[in-house]
A protein has these predicted regions:
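Extended hydrophobic leader/signal-anchor segments used for secretion and membrane insertion
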Residues: 1-107
Length: 107
């Protein structure tokens, strides 16, 4: 899959996704092992109004001021999403407009 930007799980990657660009994102840390290893790149596609999000999707999102490549653990009324890592730690509930990208491919 082609991408137009390569960066880390941060504001700049989120901005490119908000512009409709597909990006390669590199997450740092072990919170998503064994699904993702630290510094393992993924391809994220932009999340738009019509994007369908499901439990267990890996997304680039912002929770309480921090950017994460984490899982959707629960969905409430199709409008709120519980974000957390792969080891059971929950970051919190966010709205869809705080989800910038959805992992389409793990590299």
């Amino acid at each position: 899959m082609e991408y137009t930007y390569s960066g880390f799980e941060n504001r700049i990657s989120a901005e490119h996704l908000q512009k409709g660009e597909t990006v390669k994102v590199i997450g740092i840390g072990n919170s998503m092992t064994p699904i993702l290893k630290s510094k393992q790149p993924v391809i994220c596609t932009p999340v738009i109004k019509d994007t369908i999000l499901n439990k267990r999707d890996i997304v680039l999102c912002k929770v309480k001021g921090h950017y994460y490549l984490h899982l959707i653990h629960a969905i409430r009324n199709g409008e709120s999403f519980l974000i957390g890592n792969n080891h059971g730690h929950m970051n919190g509930w966010i709205s869809k407009n705080k989800i910038y990208g959805k992992v389409a491919e793990i590299l």
